[in-house]
């Protein structure tokens, strides 16, 4: 047992030495480089998708030239490198560090935009990849956080070159948030929890009026009222459905769980 432990310890020590050796090698190679050369080399690595190497060079640059404009830009570029390398948590941490250190930086609009992108592009679920359905299957927390990041960008920097794309992504995220609520409403209807389903449907109608889920929400709300023994409310809801969606299929047949795609049952 002692021999095994010694072998494991030796292996870990050698691994640590190898990592330290790589860092020391980078430091040694670049020791006489100017800030411009360091930054250019880091950019070359970034553009070549060598993200780990790029981050190392950005860190060396920042440690040697902490007050330079290249150091500040390197902090943003580090966040971007992490984003491209699918290191979401590290990217978000780098962005927050930049925002904390440089709240008035002229590239703050980009920092907000990048934060939104990191959250917006969070990995989709297995069902999303399998069925290629809408984003309502994503984590609603990620949807809200991405929306808030883009909204802050648009509000603070309406003339930013990133504002138009951020706005377009916000539209998609609002639709996704409505879809999150719809998924829950469908689930409650299937389980016979009609009060909870009605509350979710009302939330969609009130908060997500410009999404594609309003029509189905009205159909669910009408049926929920019927099941709850509230015929007047059901009739009122049906009139709203008729007025706003005169060609709705829910006018000829009530909402049914069978109307849902197969993968909705997996929620």
UniProtKB/Swiss-Prot annotation:
GO cellular component term of the entry, any: Bam protein complex
Alphabetical list of InterPro entries matching this protein: BamD, BamD-like, TPR-like_helical_dom_sf
Protein name, entry field: Outer membrane protein assembly factor BamD
UniProt cross-references to HAMAP family, sorted A to Z: OM_assembly_BamD
Lipidation (N-palmitoyl cysteine): 17
BP GO annotations: establishment of competence for transformation; Gram-negative-bacterium-type cell outer membrane assembly; protein insertion into membrane
Function of the protein: Part of the outer membrane protein assembly complex, which is involved in assembly and insertion of beta-barrel proteins into the outer membrane. Required for efficient transformation of Neisseria meningitidis by species-related DNA.
Gene designation per UniProt: bamD
Signal sequence range: 1-16
Entry keyword set: Cell outer membrane, Competence, Lipoprotein, Membrane, Palmitate, Signal
Species of the source: Neisseria meningitidis serogroup A / serotype 4A (strain DSM 15465 / Z2491)
One Pfam family linked to the record: YfiO
